[in-house]
């Protein structure tokens, strides 16, 4: 899915009304169907252009004509993309929407916002100038997508890997030109990531293509792969020796850029001080509920003591995959029995051990195919089991991360009725634009909303141990919400944010450090809680609108049908007005 889209809307289709009005004969020959065809053609050309600049996203979406291309970080490429974007923005401003139906006007709004978001990134936020990790990690992600799904024979996918690998050294050279005084935390994170990235190319990429027997192809692959490993090693030395000592930049966006980013990505227009107060209100509500539930479990222990004890309740490693399968079965049965949401397909995600080449990247992950993937259409839920070589202490610590409460919250958020459920509805999304442009407040807001909603509807039989785990996860998202705003508006330092996650978010120091660091480069990770609150308000407003005929299943189904658009757009469709999302 695309969080922000960019490229050119070709002027011949942007000026739909101008073209239609040239002569009476032309006007008569332009019925609504013709205007629709022209608009759809514009959308197709828009995404073709977008994927030219972002081929990794094209591979995920299922457009494999871009599999041999890689993102280009040169000044020339940046200038070309910006030129297209500015032309597109000018054209969109002259578009006459009177010939478009409501669905098309919504799509035009989504595309216009995506153009503005990408221009903001290139011209003002400028992560290409500040974040060393994007250069080393982008190539990894691009190659990983070619490895992880069998949409073509292994030899064909390896040819695309070679083509992409041949472009990675140039990107790393461009990084040395582009990077100007990055924040120290960005350079430090990039250095922390690089050993794993180098290992990925040394071991995981070759392992993924062991079945290929073409000697000439394997020789080409060894050359391209060795060149990437060498270039990454040189980049690592550059970061450590040259860039880190001068990394004294500021990661903060500042209030103005923060507001713009929220507006273009998620259509949030609320003043930041009011937005922040909403976050604190939700934090305090969840903190009070955590204390109440903890006292219900054991009044003699603190919430932290209870949460620590709950980590001991986990399956054995050889039972972990089955535990997730059983949880999926239980969740889908509950959803159907209680008529909470329609499950469009009986096809389940395949629960499997994380493939060897991805084990270093994730503990658990849901991998769904893109909306236009026609070959590798399976979805995989990957779970990383402890390595046989690990010590007993390390294995114990790892399995504590898969305690019963975590298994449930992960299964709800990632699968039913969270991300996988939303994926199952994708075929019903009303347009190409709605399939390809996604809002974080919708996607992550929905998945987070379902964690609480399922327990509210009675899943787990009111077990307070499940509720306290759900509340800890909610407090983590509340802390993200607040820390993101306050760090990027200069009200909270990185160290203060770390302590905030511990003290107010009830997280361990290790989790707190990782979460605070994430917030420096993911400033709007408030979308989890923000989207959840927006969906809860939409549900209340929708219930008021339809009255006694309200059905939770009907509400959820209608929400799913709208795609992954920002909540204000979903509200407009479901409520018929532009009332406030919060």
Regions found by a protein language model. Give the residues of each.
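N-terminal secretory signal peptides that target proteins for export/translocation
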Residues: 1-2
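Bacterial N-terminal signal peptides
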Residues: 5-17
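N-terminal maturation segment of proteins
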Residues: 22-582
């Amino acid at each position: 899915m695309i969080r922000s889209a960019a490229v050119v809307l070709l002027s011949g289709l942007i000026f739909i009304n101008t073209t239609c009005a040239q002569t009476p004969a032309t006007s008569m020959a332009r019925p609504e169907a013709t205007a629709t065809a022209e608009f759809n053609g514009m959308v197709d050309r828009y995404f073709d252009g977008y994927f030219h600049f972002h081929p990794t996203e094209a591979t995920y979406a299922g457009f494999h004509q871009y599999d041999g291309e890689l993102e280009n970080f040169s000044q020339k490429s940046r200038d070309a993309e910006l030129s297209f974007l500015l032309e597109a923005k000018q054209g969109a401003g002259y578009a006459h929407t009177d010939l478009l139906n409501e669905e098309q006007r919504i799509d035009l709004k989504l595309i216009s916002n995506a153009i503005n978001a990408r221009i903001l990134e290139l011209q003002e936020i400028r992560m290409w100038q500040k974040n060393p990790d994007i250069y080393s990690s982008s190539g990894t992600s691009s190659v990983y997508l070619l490895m992880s799904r069998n949409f073509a024979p292994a030899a064909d996918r390896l040819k695309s890997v070679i083509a992409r690998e041949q472009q990675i050294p140039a990107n790393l050279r461009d990084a040395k030109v582009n990077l100007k005084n990055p924040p120290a935390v960005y350079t430090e994170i990039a250095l922390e990531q690089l050993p794993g990235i180098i290992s990925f190319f040394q071991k995981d990429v070759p392992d993924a293509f062991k079945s290929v027997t073409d000697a000439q192809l394997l020789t080409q692959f060894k050359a391209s792969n060795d060149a990437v490993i060498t270039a990454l090693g040189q980049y690592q030395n550059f970061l450590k020796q040259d860039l880190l000592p001068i990394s004294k930049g500021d990661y903060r966006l500042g209030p103005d850029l923060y507001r713009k980013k929220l507006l273009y990505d998620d259509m949030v227009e609320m003043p930041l001080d009011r937005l922040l107060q909403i976050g604190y209100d939700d934090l305090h509500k969840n903190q009070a509920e955590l204390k109440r539930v903890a006292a219900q479990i054991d009044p003699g222990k603190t919430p932290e003591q209870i949460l620590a004890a709950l980590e001991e309740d986990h399956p054995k490693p050889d039972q972990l995959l089955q535990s997730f399968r059983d949880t999926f079965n239980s969740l889908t049965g509950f959803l159907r029995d209680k008529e909470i949401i329609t499950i469009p397909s009986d096809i389940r995600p395949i629960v499997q051990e994380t493939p060897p080449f991805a084990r270093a990247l994730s503990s658990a992950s849901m991998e769904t195919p893109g909306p236009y993937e026609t070959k590798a259409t399976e979805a995989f839920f990957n779970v990383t089991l402890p390595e046989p070589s690990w010590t007993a202490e390390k294995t114990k610590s790892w399995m504590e991360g898969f305690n019963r409460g975590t298994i449930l919250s992960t299964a709800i958020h990632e699968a039913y009725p969270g991300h996988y459920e939303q994926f199952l509805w994708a075929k019903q999304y009303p347009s190409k634009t709605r399939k390809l442009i996604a809002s974080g407040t919708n996607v992550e807001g929905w998945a987070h909303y379902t964690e609480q909603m399922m327990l509210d509807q009675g899943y787990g039989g009111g077990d307070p141990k499940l509720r306290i785990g759900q509340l800890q996860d909610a407090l983590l998202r509340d802390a993200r919400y607040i820390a993101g705003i306050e760090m990027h508006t200069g009200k909270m330092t990185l160290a203060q944010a770390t302590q905030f996650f511990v003290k107010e978010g009830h997280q361990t120091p290790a989790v707190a450090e990782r979460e605070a660091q994430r917030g420096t480069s993911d400033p709007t990770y408030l979308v989890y809680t923000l989207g959840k609150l927006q969906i809860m308000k939409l549900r209340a407003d929708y219930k008021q609108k339809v009255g006694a005929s309200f059905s939770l299943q009907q509400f959820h189904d209608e929400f799913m049908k709208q795609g992954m658009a920002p909540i204000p757009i979903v509200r407009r469709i479901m409520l018929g007005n532009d009332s406030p999302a919060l």
